[in-house]
Amino acid sequence: MLGRTLREVSVELKQGQITPTELCQRCLSLIKKTKFLNAYITVSEEVALKQAEESEKRYKKGHSLGDLDGIPIAVKDNFSTSGIETTCASNMLKGYVPPYNATVVQKLLDQGALLMGKTNLDEFAMGSGSTDGIFGPVKNPWSYSKQYREKRKQNSHSENEDSNWLITGGSSGGSAAAVSAFTCFAALGSDTGGSTRNPAAHCGVVGLKPSYGLVSRHGLIPLVNSMDVPGILTRCVDDAATVLGVLAGHDPKDSTTIQDPVKPFTLPSLTDVSKLCIGIPKEYLTPELSSEVQSLWSKAANLFESEGAKVTEVSLPHTSYSIVCYHVLCTSEVASNMARFDGLEYGHRCDSDVSTEAMYAATRREGFNDVVRGRILSGNFFLLKENYENYFVKAQKVRRLIANDFVNVFNSGVDVLLTPTTLSEAVPYTEFIKEDNRTRSAQDDIFTQAVNMAGLPAVSVPVALSSQGLPIGLQFIGRAFCDQQLLIVAKWFEKQVQFPVIQLQELMDDCSSVFENEKLASVSLK
């Protein structure tokens, strides 16, 4: 049951094959069994069971609120949740309980979704591994999959060697792990430079970054206001579309959202791709790209071509400047946004009574980790009067050039861009932490951050397993506010590749009934 898609289990709820309470209890049981993954910071068991009880009453009366009624979901812990602690995985906000819900959270609850809990992340969403929060790193469920462990056996590695568990990617690693491990059917992440798509690729799930302005940011604790977007993590493209249909639309509390109303939609099944033009950005073929990802990228392009689509190489000439441009703009906005955490209104406050200035300094020293403090320092440097024109203003100009590159490509007749999501599959934690956060983020955001600067929709779709038995994802990028068209193409591709279901039986042999109906599908691109 828990291995099914959101839409499938929604049908079973409506038919009475399972009740919301039974579904909720199964998810809660699995959350407890997979606690070692560290996917959740807070498990809202009482809240979820109460919501399930209310959902059950509606179903009995025949008054279902829609496809999300009674569906267990999880929310990244940088979205405000009324009455539930919201920490951003930081000492600065540990113990902070917001008095309101983020708009996206409220929209899900209004549709009857069950909030299972708040998921783990890098502190204030600054990172690409979900390793730097105060609650510890998130473990990738695929570390314990039958597929990965069998490959390790073949390579003479110890099957029980837990020191080589894999990172989830970040910063929405908790949400990706929660969906991948079947503890919920959908989860909210945030995406500033790839923080939803990166962990989606590493955890073998779908990660959608909507167009900037399509989904409200109200209640998302800001990192970079001009790039932050609530992200969606699900096990299939159809489910991502279902959640997007609920979340999208104008919000008077977020002036950047679109004015036009957005209706929920169901993705049609595309049968003919011959009229599509798929663009392959030549600048994304970098020396650091693993041979396996490169091979799958090429095979995916060939798949479209073999079905009649036009596949053409395109140029995004300012790509080489994008990661530096992103760093300048990101840290500058971080410095501005983090200024609100001064110990006066909410969050952590140091006991220092020497002076107000001393209290500010001590509060921020105790509340923020080295990564956050480092980004604040970088941002303040770029915003200094003597540096403002040479760094911040120039970066804004380069950002416009990067956005124009995408506009020019789409105006040339390209419908969708096809790129890698990450340079390689997930790496072991011990290998990941050999490099500092900033270096890792610069490497891991290489294919994803330009989309945020351009405000475009993008989705990472799992494609196949690597030779190590680990997921690899590819990214589709669409025109601004053409999210539905993007998802239609992604759905067609998903159907062709038939990504295999994660096999966790060996890990949870006492929970085999959860997975007994799942079949290992063949992978057509391997």
Curated annotation (Swiss-Prot):
Residues at the active site: K76 (charge relay system), S171 (charge relay system), S195 (acyl-ester intermediate)
Disordered: annotated segments: 147-166
EC number(s) per entry: 6.3.5.7
MF (Gene Ontology): ATP binding; glutaminyl-tRNA synthase (glutamine-hydrolyzing) activity
Keyword terms of this UniProt record: ATP-binding, Ligase, Mitochondrion, Nucleotide-binding, Protein biosynthesis
Record carries keyword Isomerase: no
Subcellular location: Mitochondrion
Single biological process term from Gene Ontology: mitochondrial translation
Keyword Mitochondrion appears in the UniProt entry: yes
InterPro entries: Amidase, Amidase_dom, AS_sf, GatA
Enzymatic reactions: L-glutamyl-tRNA(Gln) + L-glutamine + ATP + H2O = L-glutaminyl-tRNA(Gln) + L-glutamate + ADP + phosphate + H(+)
GO cellular component: glutamyl-tRNA(Gln) amidotransferase complex; mitochondrion
Subunit structure comment from the entry: Subunit of the heterotrimeric GatCAB amidotransferase (AdT) complex, composed of A (QRSL1), B (GATB) and C (GATC) subunits.
Record-stated family: Belongs to the amidase family. GatA subfamily.
Functional summary from the UniProt entry: Allows the formation of correctly charged Gln-tRNA(Gln) through the transamidation of misacylated Glu-tRNA(Gln) in the mitochondria. The reaction takes place in the presence of glutamine and ATP through an activated gamma-phospho-Glu-tRNA(Gln).
Official protein name in the record: Glutamyl-tRNA(Gln) amidotransferase subunit A, mitochondrial
The species this protein was found in: Bos taurus
Gene name in the database record: QRSL1
